[in-house]
Amino acid sequence: MYITKIVIQGFKSYKDYTVIEPLSPHHNVIVGRNGSGKSNFFAAIRFVLSDAYTHLSREERQALLHEGPGATVMSAYVEVTFANADNRFPTGKSEVVLRRTIGLKKDEYSLDKKTVSKTEVINLLESAGFSRSNPYYIVPQGRVTSLTNAKDSERLELLKEVAGTQIYENRRAESNKIMDETIQKSEKIDELLQYIEERLRELEEEKNDLAVYHKKDNERRCLEYAIYSREHDEINSVLDALEQDRIAALERNDDDSGAFIQREERIERIKAEITELNHSLELLRVEKQQNDEDYTNIMKSKVALELQSSQLSRQIEFSKKDESSKLNILSELESKISEKENELSEILPKYNAIVSEADDLNKRIMLLKNQKQSLLDKQSRTSQFTTKKERDEWIRNQLLQINRNINSTKENSDYLKTEYDEMENELKAKLSRKKEIEISLESQGDRMSQLLANITSINERKENLTDKRKSLWREEAKLKSSIENVKDDLSRSEKALGTTMDRNTSNGIRAVKDIAERLKLEGYYGPLCELFKVDNRFKVAVEATAGNSLFHIVVDNDETATQILDVIYKENAGRVTFMPLNKLRPKAVTYPDASDALPLIQYLEFDPKFDAAIKQVFSKTIVCPSIETASQYARSHQLNGITLSGDRSDKKGALTAGYRDYRNSRLDAIKNVKTYQIKFSDLQESLEKCRSEIESFDQKITACLDDLQKAQLSLKQFERDHIPLKDELVTITGETTDLQESMHHKSRMLELVVLELHTLEQQANDLKSELSSEMDELDPKDVEALKSLSGQIENLSHEFDAIIKERAHIEARKTALEYELNTNLYLRRNPLKAEIGSDNRIDESELNSVKRSLLKYENKLQIIKSSSSGLEEQMQRINSEISDKRNELESLEELQHEVATRIEQDAKINERNAAKRSLLLARKKECNEKIKSLGVLPEEAFIKYVSTSSNAIVKKLHKINEALKDYGSVNKKAYEQFNNFTKQRDSLLARREELRRSQESISELTTVLDQRKDEAIERTFKQVAKSFSEIFVKLVPAGRGELVMNRRSELSQSIEQDISMDIDTPSQKSSIDNYTGISIRVSFNSKDDEQLNINQLSGGQKSLCALTLIFAIQRCDPAPFNILDECDANLDAQYRSAIAAMVKEMSKTSQFICTTFRPEMVKVADNFYGVMFNHKVSTVESISKEEAMAFVEG
């Protein structure tokens, strides 16, 4: 085992966290300047190993804490880690960590991070080989010097300490102390025995007087027993009578209470029913009032519609008469039009044929005339011109003129054709428009019907929506009335609940709910009373058990409770008690396995997540049939017992019973408040839903009104558009006729232009033909042709005139017929056709709509009448029910008053009886105590005075008491004292014998301890002396050294003799008291020269001898590790190497940690550490051998 790591923080100069690792299991050297903290490092190790700093005061602990600039250090610790591969520490671990921590108010140890006591640490170190009797495994500065300057007697004490004689001395001192105490106890026992013997002799004399006293005293006790017994029996009889009265009263009270509760529940139900009936009656009144208002409004509307229907009927009747007249006129017109159209249809073929024939004749006549004129011109030019040249010149001029006329005629023909085509297109457009107007006028009736039907449909939809909205208005009024009623009920219930608790609690509960809603706390569950349900049979028991705990607020954890409490304190909102579920730890309860003790909690219904809160309040309560049974179980099972009537016996023995006002039930009040809150919330939700529907119907009705307005505007627009169409038809009809006439005229003009063009072309051809001929007289053919042409022209002219006359006659009739039709008959017929039926359709449609509305109103009125009749019947029935229930309520309340008075009277009687019973029980207890005070009575006491009167007993008791006065000074405890003293004497004799044997055992133990101490000192001296000689030879090969035990001479105690004790010769047997000291004798130059005493040596030689003695002690009692603080400081140069070599040799089996300023120790070390000091803070770092050598040599 060895130290592997040391951690220091806050200890002396080591302020910061300092780790020294890894430490070699052999030789470790620490170097550093003076004052850097090397000694503090060793002090830290001693601090942990309890070699020093065992009992520290506050000031001493303060001195060990680091003091320097910066923050104040309030605690410090040193931690040492041991390699435990050899299991010298019996922990079963390969590594052991020991830490000691100090502060201003603490000083504690920890082993492997577990707190342990100082005694456990000391025992652990001793089990690993750290002996308290040998502190030389740690050698601090100054110890070598003190050992060097020590006297022989001090070295002897050191040897005793190493040998462990202190343990023997402690045990011997303890034995001597016990021996002294034993002697003192024996002496005291002897004194007590002497006193007891004297007292026994005195008591022997007092026993005779006591016998006479006992005889008379027994008589007295018998008489007193007779008196007390009779009084006890009388009290029991009275108590039995009172108990019977109490049981009878309780049974009567239970019956009355049960009936009272049932009647009270019935009263509450009747009140609730009356309230509900009043609510229903109020709703019926509101509905009846609404029905009356609806009836009045519908009647007003019905009267208005009836007036409108009458007006419309008259209008339709008048319209029908007017329409009949118009139909007759239309019929006559249609007849005339048909006649004229038939006549015109007969004339038109003749007219067209004769026009065609006249045109053909006219064309033929014109051609013949042109031919004739051409021949005559040709004949006249013979006389007109003298030469052919003049003629040709004239012909050419005529041709030019004719060509100009032809071109002009063609242009005129094209212009006429263009005008004709334009007129034809215009005619087609007007005819098309005329047809459209006629079709439109024909379809106006259907369109009018559609518009009227649409308006009627919209009105019906609006009326249906209005009716539904009215129903919703009625429903809204009912809901408002119900909400007001429920709000009143809720207010009354809250007031009733408020009377069951103080104002602060009531305010607090309301505030907590509001705060939880504001903060949106999901962990708020509400008061305990709202988290469970219970059967009405156990309601009283639950209230009596929970008390004010019913109003405790249940939350999920203490954080939620803290949040709410902060707001409550800030707003001063009341007082509440919280039950955080995460902090509740209800204990498991074992219930009795019996049918008359049932756990109250099993009759509660609740969410499992509230199990802890419910158990916290109700788990320790059982329901019992009577208070007596409850009391028995309360005592036997440490549970709270309760009856169904609320009588309670808790586990501490307290009883709670008596009259209870069942009308002020907290659970009922809570239930009512919760019920009305739910009703209020439901009604509010229904009201919001109803208002939302009303708003929706308002929007729909508004949309219907918009649609109706649009439909009415469409109808008006249609009516406005109807008149212009009629006017336009008349106008188009006239324009069409005029246009047809113009076209006919244009056509005639075009025919004439074409004929003229043909004539001009013919003339041009004739002139061209004449231009190519000679200028001669007409040939015979031409003359013959001229004659023939004249005759044909005359014949055709006569025929043409006849045809023209006929055509003129036909054309005049045709024109007259067309004019009659277009300007008269058609114009009169079309408006009539449009007018007939249109007004009637409008009026009839409106009349039908009015009749439908009247029918609806009739139905509504019938429904309202029926509903009002039903409502009146319901109201009468409800009024009757209310009257019956009020009568029943009055009778029940009267009976309740009587029963309550009787219960209260019974309660007062019970209270008086209870007070009387308490007095009797006190007297009974007093009698029992007096009887007990009589002690054990003789057998005759129970029968001797049974038949004796009380007066005789009192007289005898008086005589006996007078006789006993003569024995007032007798020792009444003589027998008892005699027996007690006898027992004490026997006990003291046995104790004295026990002390004698103990004294002998202690004497033997003291002798053995003295012998073992002598043997331990002699054995240790031999071992240390031998090791000293061996080690000295190794350190000083040329010399020798030895330890010499000094003892007193047997003849003279004052003369010291030096007796050399050779380790090879047997030690002389002598007492340890003859030892006076240990001296050191050495020779540094020769093994044979006379040895010198240590006082004769130089300082360096003394230090070497002291170190040799330390090494000898360490070899004799080796430790797992050794700590040397500058042990070579005072050595001469020639011995430092020897000491370093010795340390190196011993470090093979034991770890060494040394501080030094000398290079010899550094040269043989394994690990090196440097201590630095900066700003009053020490640190330790691992360094190389070269750095260590450089430091000690520099």
Swiss-Prot record:
* Keywords on record: Acetylation, ATP-binding, Cell cycle, Cell division, Chromosome, Coiled coil, Mitosis, Nucleotide-binding, Nucleus
UniProt KW RNA-binding keyword:
no
What does its PTM field state?
A: Acetylation at Lys-105 and Lys-106 by ECO1 is important for genome stability and S phase sister chromatid cohesion.
Q: Where is the SMC hinge domain?
A: 522-634
Quick one: which residues bind ATP?
Answer: 32-39
Molecular-function GO term, any one: DNA binding
Compartments where located: Nucleus; Chromosome
Q: Which domain of life is it from?
A: Eukaryota
Q: Name one GO biological process term.
A: mitotic sister chromatid cohesion
Where would one find coiled-coil regions in this protein?
176-497, 668-908, 970-1006
| Cellular component, GO, one term | meiotic cohesin complex
Q: Per the annotation, which location comes first and is thus the protein's main one? A: nucleus
What span is annotated as the signal peptide, if there is one? Answer: none
Keyword Membrane on this protein? Answer: no
Q: Which residues carry this modification: N6-acetyllysine?
A: 105-106
According to its UniProt entry, the function of this protein is described as: Involved in chromosome cohesion during cell cycle and in DNA repair. Central component of cohesin complex. The cohesin complex is required for the cohesion of sister chromatids after DNA replication. The cohesin complex apparently forms a large proteinaceous ring within which sister chromatids can be trapped. At anaphase, the complex is cleaved and dissociates from chromatin, allowing sister chromatids to segregate.
Similarity field: Belongs to the SMC family. SMC3 subfamily.
* Domains as described in the record: The flexible SMC hinge domain, which separates the large intramolecular coiled coil regions, allows the heterotypic interaction with the corresponding domain of psm1, forming a V-shaped heterodimer. The two heads of the heterodimer are then connected by different ends of the cleavable rad21 protein, forming a ring structure.
Outline the subunit composition: Cohesin complexes are composed of the psm1/smc1 and psm3/smc3 heterodimer attached via their SMC hinge domain, rad21/scc1 which link them, and psc3/scc3, which interacts with rad21. Associates with sor1.
Q: What is this protein called?
A: Structural maintenance of chromosomes protein 3
Q: Which organism is it from?
A: Schizosaccharomyces pombe (strain 972 / ATCC 24843)
